[in-house]
Amino acid sequence: MAVRQIKDGEYTATIYRLIKEARYGEAIQVLSNELQKQYRSRAGLSLLGYCYYQIQDFVNAADCYEQLIQISPEVEEYKLYYAQSLYKACMYPEAMKATFALDNAAYQSKMLKLQASVKYGEEDISGAKSLVEQMPSEDPESEINMGCLLYKEGHYEEACKKFITAMQVMGYKQDLSFNIALCYYSMKQYAPALKHIADIIERGIREHPELGVGMTTEGIEVRSVGNTLVLHETALIEAFNLKAAIEYQLKNYEAAQEALTDMPPRSEEELDPVTLHNQALMNMDTKPTEGFEKLQFLLQQNPFPPETFGNLLLLYSKYEYFDLAADVLAENAHLTYKFLTPYLYDFLDAMITCQTAPEEAFLKLDELAGMLTEQMRKLTKQVQEARHNRDDEAVKKAVNEYDETLEKYIPVLMAQAKIYWNMENYQMVEKIFRKSVEFCNEHDIWKLNVAHVLFMQDNKYKEAIGFYEPIVKKHYDNILNVSAAVLANLCVSYIMTSQNEEAEELMRKIEKEEEQIAYENPDKKIYHLCIVNLVIGTLYCAKGNYEFGISRVIKSLEPYNKKLGTDTWYHAKRCFLSLLENMSKHMIMLRDDVIVECIQFLEHCEIYGRNILAVIEQPLEEERMHIGKNTVTYESRQLKALLYEITSWNL
């Protein structure tokens, strides 16, 4: 960026105009340039420190104020601003040391507040509490400080009351409203939390339209608003992050992503750690490589969101990067005790063990499951006793604790089941699920996985229907919210139990919804009905009826520009590979017209599959596939060449 040229005599006026117009970046550039000429100018350093503070660059602000203290040690404000800048930069030991230089009685109250904030930042809650108790009780900020301490101790309800009292005394303040929302979120009372968040957002839009709320979601290209003090005071970033977290907890994943794009636009290097963490987490399904990079980057920062460490390890386990998870645990032993609960550590330890010693891992998981089931039995008893005593608060507390324990138990149970699933020992998987029916029979994830394991056993389609049907009926009005695999498995189960009418009715329902979406959004690709037909085609191929099965597979991918995708190609090529294998062994013969149909299909896939990946590679794969080979076009040519070779047709 070119340095602004300023005429003689206009320097001071230009600087103050830039500051007045909140063009701090330009002001910093001019001031930095001028300070090279006038080394350690007090006026220049003071303005530069102020500008750095306004754009939240606290490290450089602290550097300016440190120089100012050396120039003018008698000015107490510089000592205060220096300590505040160090605190804001999370340099807590340095900030605490700087506060001791404040010996003017007029700054006693501010010094105490700053020292308490430093102790709070260092998570020295008892130290912070003793300092807060020294402050005047009539100071409304003491209510806020006590609220923060109560929140940190997990007393969310009492903390919430403190913040509400402070708001009544001080009037509406965005940061207080956010604190109240955060308390409600921690108590899992999402409706009042969202109400306070909505208030913050509405006020931010009304008072600061220049911050461009919602512009990115609308697809409008806007320049970064930067990390200004104004943005910080609106609490918009915090509000949108909390809204995203609530929507994510409620499994409204699109709304969660939208909350992140609705926030005022900033460039990636300007993003705060919480936003970066949430972006990584909520876009993991579509941008896993990027997500891992962001979480790994955050782990190197100080401080980072406390959830980062556990989430990175859990995601490594989800994607089966157990070696990486083990490395992170070994390299960051000091973080283990600080950021991982005993439950999470034991769970991750068992998951890592799965890779090399599945039997040992199963025993570790079994021990963890036993501990959690014991807790749930105790909590069930507490709920019954509280209901008998008509103690609604105790009932509510015990039910919440039970639900939290169940959410810990489900992943442990699924990890146990997966060990036997990978061995294709489906009877053992079913046995594990049956043992957990006492606790999980109402849980959607449990019901879904029970359905899958029954479906895989071939002779239990009727029982599988009993579990798949309630899931589908629950979302019948928005049937495309159900995964295509579930719909396909239910259709196959209907066919295998001679309930063809039910299968056809379900397929008509899917077709009707797909037509409606195609009408509203012609460019959107929807694969549900296509995958259902592909799975049915696969079923007929598996039963040896290749002519009907392959024909169904081919028809399901029409029109190719709408139906050909990585997932649909995966199902189609499996059928073709099975067909070619059986033809090469002379176990089946195809009529010439069917072979012609197959060749035409593969040629269509070759045309439409140029920009479609044949395989979605793992995000952290070191050896990447050749870009020219990882396409549907390349694989369809390979299949066509094999078909010509096996049938001895002339090219």
UniProtKB/Swiss-Prot annotation:
Keyword terms, alphabetized:
Cell projection, Cilium, Cilium biogenesis/degradation, Coiled coil, Repeat, TPR repeat
What's one Pfam family the UniProt record gives for this protein?
TPR_6
What's a BP term from Gene Ontology annotated to this protein? protein polyglutamylation
Tell me where the TPR repeats sit in this chain: 8-41, 42-75, 140-173, 175-207, 372-405, 410-443, 445-478, 530-563
State one molecular function term (GO). intraciliary transport particle B binding
Keyword Secreted on entry: no
Compartment annotation:
Cell projection, Cilium
User: GO CC terms on record?
Assistant: axonemal microtubule; cilium; intraciliary transport particle B
Which SUPFAM superfamilies does the record associate with it? TPR-like
Report if keyword DNA damage is assigned.
no
Q: Please list the coiled coil stretches.
A: 494-521
Q: Which family does it belong to?
A: Belongs to the TTC30/dfy-1/fleer family.
What's this chain's function? Answer: Required for polyglutamylation of axonemal tubulin. Plays a role in anterograde intraflagellar transport (IFT), the process by which cilia precursors are transported from the base of the cilium to the site of their incorporation at the tip.
Name of the protein in question: Intraflagellar transport protein 70A
Q: Give the classification, highest ranks.
A: Eukaryota, Metazoa, Chordata, Craniata, Vertebrata
